[in-house]
């Protein structure tokens, strides 16, 4: 059983195709800050420069808060979604709580419209963002110590 589990984990790691060497904390924080600013202020040119061509975006609302139902794949799909979100951020700006690392990935915690707590983690390969992970599921965010995340309707995220 132990051997099968090790083999299963190895296959999962290979299929994930994650970068072999993690980004430095300093570089990760710089990229996370640049991504936050570009995505919140609708700077699509800067956002394009930060994203890898094959970037993917995943969101988890746990069925309790709005989130994209399917992953986005490719730079054009991710940019299109972030252009939509930038218009929403202009009406209801995100409140940045802090930058941090989550499971080794740089990112940030925000409070979105409807008092929804959101964690965004960025997988970085070289100097480009290869994957965006957005966690909005309140059950999985309780450990952040930000009180009770809101469950009211908010906007969908990428």
Segments and roles (model prediction):
Residues 76-158:
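Low-complexity, glycine/alanine/valine/leucine- and proline-rich hydrophobic stretches
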């Amino acid at each position: 059983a132990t051997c099968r589990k090790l083999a299963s984990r190895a296959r999962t790691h290979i299929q994930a195709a994650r970068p072999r060497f993690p980004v430095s904390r300093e570089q990760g924080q710089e990229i996370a800050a640049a991504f936050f600013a570009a995505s919140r202020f609708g700077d699509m040119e800067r956002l394009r420069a930060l994203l890898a061509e094959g970037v993917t975006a995943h969101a988890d609302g746990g069925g309790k808060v709005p989130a994209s139902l399917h992953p986005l794949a490719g730079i054009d799909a991710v940019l299109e979604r972030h252009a939509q979100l930038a218009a929403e951020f202009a009406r209801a700006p995100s409140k940045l709580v802090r930058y941090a690392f989550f499971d080794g990935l740089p990112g940030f915690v925000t409070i979105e419209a409807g008092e929804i707590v959101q964690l965004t983690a960025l997988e970085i390969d070289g100097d480009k963002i290869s994957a965006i992970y957005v966690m909005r599921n309140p059950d999985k965010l309780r450990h952040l110590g930000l009180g009770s995340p809101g469950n009211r309707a908010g906007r969908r995220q990428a």
